[in-house]
């Protein structure tokens, strides 16, 4: 009988299509699939494709009202993971029409919205996404990008230096502003609100913004350099967030900050649009990322969150350090650092990059190295991250035995010494400690650090 038949059927009959030629407009995903015992990998891969696109658990008569061939996700390739028992990489292609233009929120809802709780899978991890130009062009992307930021700040040929103001909670606004001033006066380019500083009883946001702006202008006048403080605009509602961003602009602040995962992509994209329209730089913190990306076999790899952020919009994003207190492997980290900064990134599995990604001149995002780093790490950081980065020393600045400003001086001297040594052709990896020692002869602040 040709007619409609109800009943449960295998996904792989419809959604596993190994001979499919991927289109240039498809969004491609690489999933790490761990099927339940007894579930063949093709069925598991097809189930992922189905549940994250057009499928449901049974045949429904309304399937006849649409063209599945046009709209279904397809699992087009499966490979076993070397060295892992019962783990596979399933490659899925999604037709562009499944996604709303300019909405990271909708893209993630579709691709990772429902399928991660699926019974046939023991675990599932989204390792990488290929965003086609046809889709990325519907996004504004970062408000300004790397070159525009350098021109705004008038700082070239070196990484930028930042510092998170500690203790992160408990300072009054006036004392907070004082710490900001000391760090900037000492030689840092930026200071930063901690990600959990929003507007608490001991320091309301407006007071903090005012004192930080005062610190900025004073440090700028005394050093002749442009300074910034990441004013955290993250709030409980989008309206309140925008209110804070507007106030930052009225104070003449150059940069605001947002926690993009806890704040959400919808809020983040709105803020990014405001920042471009009003000449504010946007610093992005990735609070909550480890909840999503730390498990090796379940969740989402940070490189996906990084790509999503570049589409949603941000000028800086925290991306691990390779050397500090938080986890991050060197090649993998450099992989997503390139995905953030570069225009065109070749597929390279050794760096965790599953697809060639062409951003077609979408502005880049500056990676921020932050967390447990101090002056002895400076040569390594300069070498690993290169010029287009922000190196952030929190305790590494404020923990200086002589105080905040000397701590800032020590960091700036160390950075300038490393950049000069690199430009003279010296090997930072080998001679790093020696370079820092030489510099400390001329800088008592660095010697004390």
From Swiss-Prot:
It comes from the Eukaryota. Binds 1 Mg(2+) ion per subunit. It is found in: Plastid, Chloroplast. Keywords: Calvin cycle, Carbon dioxide fixation, Chloroplast, Disulfide bond, Lyase, Magnesium, Metal-binding, Methylation, Monooxygenase, Oxidoreductase, Photorespiration, Photosynthesis, Plastid. Mg(2+) binds at residues 192, 194-195. Substrate binds at residues 114, 164, 168, 286, 318, 370. The modification N6,N6,N6-trimethyllysine is found at residue 5. The modification N6-carboxylysine is found at residue 192. The keyword Magnesium applies. Its cofactor is Mg(2+). The keyword Nucleotide-binding does not apply. The disulfide bond which can form in the large chain dimeric partners within the hexadecamer appears to be associated with oxidative stress and protein turnover. One of its GO terms (biological process) is photorespiration. The active site is at 166 (proton acceptor), 285 (proton acceptor). Its EC number is 4.1.1.39. It catalyses: 2 (2R)-3-phosphoglycerate + 2 H(+) = D-ribulose 1,5-bisphosphate + CO2 + H2O; D-ribulose 1,5-bisphosphate + O2 = 2-phosphoglycolate + (2R)-3-phosphoglycerate + 2 H(+). InterPro entries: RuBisCO (IPR033966), RuBisCo_large_chain_AS (IPR020878), RuBisCO_lsu_C (IPR000685), RuBisCO_lsu_C_sf (IPR036376), RuBisCO_lsu_fd_N (IPR017443), RuBisCO_lsu_N_sf (IPR036422), RuBisCO_lsuI (IPR020888). The record marks 325 as: Transition state stabilizer. One of its GO terms (cellular component) is chloroplast. CDD domains: RuBisCO_large_I. RuBisCO catalyzes two reactions: the carboxylation of D-ribulose 1,5-bisphosphate, the primary event in carbon dioxide fixation, as well as the oxidative fragmentation of the pentose substrate in the photorespiration process. Both reactions occur simultaneously and in competition at the same active site. The basic functional RuBisCO is composed of a large chain homodimer in a 'head-to-tail' conformation. In form I RuBisCO this homodimer is arranged in a barrel-like tetramer with the small subunits forming a tetrameric 'cap' on each end of the 'barrel'. Heterohexadecamer of 8 large chains and 8 small chains; disulfide-linked. The disulfide link is formed within the large subunit homodimers. This is Ribulose bisphosphate carboxylase large chain.
